[in-house]
Structures are given as C-alpha cells and as structure tokens.
Amino acid sequence: MIDTHCHIIYGVDDGSRSLEESMKMVEIYLANGFTKTIATSHFDRSRYMVDPDEIREKAAILNAEIAKRSMDFKIYPGHEIQVEPNTVKLINDGSLNKLADSRYVLLELPFMNKALFLKDLIFNIQLEGLVPIIAHAERYAYVKENPDYLLDFIKMGALIQVNYSSIVSSQRTTRTLLERNMVHFLGTDAHQSEWRSPNIKDEKREIIDIIGEDKFKILSQTNPQKILDDEYIGSGYDQIKEAKKKKRSIFDFWRKK
C-alpha cells in the first residue's frame, strides 16, 4: 500500500519529533502493509510554514537510514497546503512541494468556515496543469453537515482524500463518502509512532467491509501509484451515487406544521 498523507518528516510541524521517531513510524508502516508514503508536512501561516527544501533534505536522510537498515520503504516529498487566495503563486515560486514532484497538490481547507474563494482557486490551480486533492475531506464541519458540498469540486476535477482513522472518528461522513464513490485516496494522516500512528489494521478491515477489496486496492494502491508516476486520475463524477433518502417518520407531517 501507499500512503498519500502523513507527517513523518521530523522536527518541522506537529508530526514526528526526531529521526528515530520517524523510523519507528516506518516500522509500523511496514507492519501494516505499506511500502511507500508521501510526506505532507504542513504549510499553514497560522501554525507551520515548513520549508520545501527541508522536507526534501530530511526525506533524503530518512531514505538513506531506511536503506542502511535494509527496509523496503520509501518516502517522497510533498506538502499539506492550507488554502489561501495566492496558493498558486506560492506553488509557482517554489514555496510549496507538489506530491512526489507530480501534477498533484494536497489542499487543506478551513475546518469550520468555508473558503469562499475555493472554486476560483481550484480553477486557477487547474490552469497551471495541476490537480488539486482535498485532504481529509470528511473532517470539515460543513462536509459533515452536507457531503454534497464536495460535488461541485469533484465535477471540476478535484480529487478527495479521506483518513483511515475517520471510519471511527467521523464514521457517518466517511461511510457516506465511501459508499457514494466520492473518495479517490485513503491516507493515514500519521503524525507519530503512538499518537495518530500509521497502525490502521482495524480501520482497513472496516473500510473493506464497506467498499470491498477491489475498491480498497484502487484507493490505497492504484491511485496513489498514479500520483508517484504522475499519471492522470479522473474524478469519476459520473460514478457518484445519489444520496440515500432519509426514511420518513410518521412525525414528519407534524414537524412541518
């Protein structure tokens, strides 16, 4: 499997605190069936503005240590980009890493309030020949309230990543997105070896129960590998299923009064 979202680069954000902590994460990754991950350290002006070169340098150090220990694992550089109106400029001037030097960029949205400029931003990102991926879409309050919020962006060609762990913490929304074919990638969003670790064995089983082995392979292997190979991934907008209609209650009539 390939992880598309993690904070394995040490000493730069709220993720791993040391090289050895990162190596413990690699051990957990391997025990869970992963062989590759994209390091998506934060770029967020309110918290962490991790330098793109530092991500690359520390990824290289970690990969050298991985090889030294004869582990079958590789780390690729990336960024988790908190959206702002001038995100495209920051990408173009080299302040932000694309995922594994591909056409794909991972975007983090505000958690509580909608980014009113998001549609324009996605359009402008696409004008640059890039493909936006919305990180942990299930965690945003407005997506929990209305998963259809994502439909316009998927129709534009944006892709959706959800966290394995959210099948527990945001179960209803995650299940809805998975069942309706609105997800393109699974990610651990792993931060450390114990707190928010890459250990997703239980979550993996639950997700497979929902979408089946074949679809799980697409979200955890096929599509992530296409990022690494810089291959096109369609949004599959026409494959999205209608929302299930809520069961009506005998009391609904009186509620409308």
Positions of predicted regions on the chain:
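A general structural detector for well-ordered alpha-helical segments in enzyme core domains, enriched
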Residues: 21-25, 54-62, 121, 149-150, ...
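Short acidic, glycine/proline-enriched helix-loop-strand junctions
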Residues: 48-55, 69-74, 195-223
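Short acidic/histidine-rich active-site segments
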Residues: 182-198
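Non-catalytic positions within long, well-ordered alpha-helices that form the structural scaffold/packing
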Residues: 30, 126, 178-179
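Mid-to-C-terminal alpha-helical segments outside catalytic/metal-binding sites
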Residues: 205-257
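Extended substrate/RNA-proximal surfaces in nucleic-acid metabolism proteins
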Residues: 49-161, 239-257
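An N-terminally biased module of ancient metal coordination in phosphate/nucleic-acid-related enzymes
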Residues: 1-71
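Active-site beta-loop-alpha junctions enriched in small/polar residues
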Residues: 7-9, 13, 42-43, 78-82, ...
